[in-house]
Amino acid sequence: MNFKVRVIDLAGSCCRLGALQFGTKVVETPGCLIYNRSGVVPHLTPDILETLDNVPPIMHTPLASIIEEPGLIKLRGYGKGLASFIGYKDNSVYISASDYQGEAMYQYNENKSISVWTKTGRTKVTPDDYSKFVEVCRPSWYQSLCDTVPANASIKRTRKSVDRTLEFLDQCLKYREKHDSLKTSELWAAVEGGGLVDERQRSAKESATRPVFGFTLEGFGSDQMNVETIFELLPLTTQNLPVEKPRLIHAIGSPTINSLSRSSKLTEVEEENGNDSSNDQDRTATFSLLNLREDRYNEDFSPLVSGCKCFVCSNHTRAYIHHLIINNEMLGGVLLMTHNLFQYIEFFRCIRTSLKNNKWKELRKLFDA
């Protein structure tokens, strides 16, 4: 696996374009990963996902969704890795220790383990337990075990979080060094620090001294982390990380484009297609929330988004999807997820194109308007 990065200086604001290559697959950055639970993308089966264009070739699977089912014993017996087990043979897998889709109960983490919450309750996971599980999953990337705390955690608890996470990282590295089967899986260091600038910087500086492939920025997806705090902490954190290594952030939420700008680049891209995409940017940047349960859509025969080239907008109408939703048809969720995924992937493509063509400020204005 290798990562190529190109830093672009736009009127004093540094941004990065990059390409993360593993085997024949490439993830262009800034970009996104496809989130799934237990190997299932919400509403979409593997065969449907394969029909979509430009889907990132790596699946983000949180530990909590797979540690119980399929679990260590089944995956070890299967012997072909998690990607094959869940039906995504042509895709790769990224395993994260954190999962922001559930409630974070950080107070149950301990000095030698973290608590992972499954359907049957609490499971303690040590760095060695985690590494053994990752070993049978055979992911392309995996995150180091981490003790994530919210922005409002006390100073003492936040410092302990950073200390624990660094110790967990060292133990994951030690296990990886002793087991050749993990050498094909790249380890990403988790950067913690809650809402404290000093601890964020300490975590970043210490993590940067370890032999890791990249970094995950933790804690920005918690409910206690407001937008102003995110904008303050991101640039102060990333400035302490090596420029040549990729960064990944979990659950940044709705201010994604602002976060990309304020963080002085989260990740990076070298786009081969140099076509002007100003029309695409206009379409993607102008949006509103549709509640298709409302009765006013029962005779609306327009597409979800005018000009959208996704399968849903090319073949179906708001009225049809309204009918599916109010009758609780499974196809309604499938079509909405297909459209939203297409739009989100296009959103990042427009960001990359605007950076390459030196039109980042113009794109920002469309979102700020």
Curated annotation (Swiss-Prot):
The keyword tRNA processing applies. The lineage of its organism: Eukaryota, Metazoa, Placozoa, Uniplacotomia, Trichoplacea. This is Queuine tRNA-ribosyltransferase accessory subunit 2. Gene3D superfamilies: Queuine tRNA-ribosyltransferase-like. Its main location: cytoplasm. Belongs to the queuine tRNA-ribosyltransferase family. QTRT2 subfamily. Binds 1 zinc ion per subunit. Its cofactor is Zn(2+).
